[in-house]
Amino acid sequence: MRRAPPTAAAFLPSTLTLPTLRNAAASCTGCDLYKNATQTVFGEEPARATLLLVGEQPGDQEDVAGHPFVGPAGRVLDKALKEAGIARNQVYVTNAVKHFKWEPQGKRRKHKKPSAAEVAACR
């Protein structure tokens, strides 16, 4: 028998606002990514942003800090936004999944690509 793909549907609040979705994501166990992550990394900045940027997943530094795009990818993003004349606080930044997927590599946590099912669970 085939196992149903993971889903976060059971964790969706009845009222879909950024604050209620943030709270729901913080307690989501809809897929296994939450098990090894330090915390949920939800999207940030203005609710009515003119630009939305979606990354693959939080990285090691984002997992520790609890904020998206604060590590190396965030520095590249900040530089690109500055060159384009776009203020970071005008951009809503988030990731396709809200937990850092990794595998140990010595003392480091090495990024591991989330599966299509994990991404689908986080939609």
Task: Name each model feature, range by range.
Residues 1-123:
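A polyanion-binding, active-site-adjacent surface
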